[in-house]
């Protein structure tokens, strides 16, 4: 278990400094249209094979079409892979961009493009932009990354106020708790390192607050730090144990399922942007075995339940859900029964937050090798997401060298989805 403000804010910020900067940033985003839209980005690190999930080619040669067959969904004319049966029942809630492309088949550079909307120069991640422009809604962190940090998920020149709150722990583990909530002021961190969990710590601080009745000598920034430790919103958001066993099983008792459940709790409690950084999708070998045994059953259950849960709670209209890897996989199967990296064409899935469900935008060619029409890229995706969140992409921000820069260069809002 790691305790400390540097861990909590992901990029070495001291807690009072981060909160002060966050308070200043929050004033820039009030009153914008879309201010109430949150984002859950399920990032499938390594690259989801969308030719085997959301854009199958049953008429292609065997070395392209692979082992899986398409199945019908609850939307006439839209099919998905046979190992996505639960998602097939919720196709009316999501839309598919089947002509998504950026041409970059390299780890790292493609990740950066998909998470920032910029190909080359270091730029802040989408979640950092949302945190910087809008600030926090309450004491719940506005931008959260789980269950592990990603190198391209940071704030870059926006500074520590826009850094993600990192949950560096697997929410599917027994006794899961959030390790990186730092205690304010002179509270001995050793008292928190005994693995009794976040909730016991919060309960103790709450009893102290009730006894003292006031914050005492805290300045306003340290009061906010104390608030993070004691607020009902934060306690509720991180308390997975309060969910019924039935609810937890509905999402799946695995990393992706419990991460999606925690993400729902976070946006319900006030977070603006939650990135789920999920690994093991780089299927260079045994693509079909890995997909049908673990990867797709987990994704199918977690994603379908997230969409159902958000919809039933009346949250889907105000929660944008995005699913993608940094790229797709090659149309042609390699000698190891795998598919390699493929940036020239893949499928991006979007739901909620103002996105109309049950639509397909664009199309790939007969092998899913390149867009057949209406190519759409990361800048368009970024422009659409920022539009839905009410982020002014013309806003000038300043690098550490005081150089003015727009939050996004180019890109169009994908009106076909709205």
Show where each model-derived region lies.
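Ligand-binding pockets and gating/stacking loops
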Residues: 1-418
């Amino acid at each position: 278990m790691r305790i400390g403000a540097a861990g909590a804010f992901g990029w070495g910020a001291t807690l009072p400094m981060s909160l002060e900067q966050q308070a200043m940033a929050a004033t820039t985003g009030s009153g914008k249209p879309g201010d109430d839209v949150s984002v859950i980005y399920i990032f499938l690190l390594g690259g989801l094979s969308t030719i085997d999930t959301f854009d199958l080619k049953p008429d292609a040669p065997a070395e392209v079409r692979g082992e899986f067959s398409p199945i019908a969904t609850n939307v006439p004319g839209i099919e998905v892979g046979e190992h996505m049966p639960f998602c097939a029942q919720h196709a009316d809630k999501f839309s598919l961009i089947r002509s998504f492309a950026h041409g970059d088949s390299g780890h790292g550079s493609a990740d950066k493009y998909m998470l920032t909307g910029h190909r080359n120069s270091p730029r802040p991640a989408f979640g950092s932009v949302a945190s910087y422009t809008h600030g926090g809604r309450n004491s719940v962190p506005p931008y959260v990354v789980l269950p592990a940090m990603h190198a391209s998920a940071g704030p870059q020149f926006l500074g520590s106020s826009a850094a993600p709150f990192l949950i560096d722990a697997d929410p599917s583990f027994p006794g899961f708790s959030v390790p990186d909530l730092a205690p304010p002021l002179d509270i001995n961190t050793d008292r928190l390192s005994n693995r009794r969990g976040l909730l016991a710590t919060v309960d103790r601080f709450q009893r102290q607050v009730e006894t003292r009745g006031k914050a005492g000598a805290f300045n306003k920034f340290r009061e906010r730090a104390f608030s993070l430790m004691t607020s009902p919103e934060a306690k509720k958001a991180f308390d997975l144990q309060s969910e019924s066993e039935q609810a937890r099983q509905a999402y799946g008792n695995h990393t992706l399922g419990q991460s999606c459940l925690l993400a729902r709790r976070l946006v319900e409690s006030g977070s603006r942007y939650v990135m789920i950084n999920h690994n093991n999708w780089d299927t260079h070998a045994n693509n079909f075995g890995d997909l049908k045994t673990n990867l797709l059953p987990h994704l199918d259950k977690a994603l379908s339940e997230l969409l159902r849960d958000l919809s039933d709670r009346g949250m889907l209209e105000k929660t944008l859900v995005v699913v993608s890897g940094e790229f797709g996989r090659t149309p042609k199967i390699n000698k190891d029964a795998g598919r390699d990296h493929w940036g020239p064409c893949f499928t991006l899935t979007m739901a909620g937050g103002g996105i109309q469900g049950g639509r397909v935008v664009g199309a790939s060619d007969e092998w899913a090798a390149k867009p057949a029409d209406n190519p759409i890229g990361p800048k368009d995706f970024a422009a659409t997401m920022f539009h839905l969140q009410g982020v002014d992409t013309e806003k000038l921000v300043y690098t550490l060298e005081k150089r003015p820069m727009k939050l996004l260069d180019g890109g169009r809002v994908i009106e076909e989805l709205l």
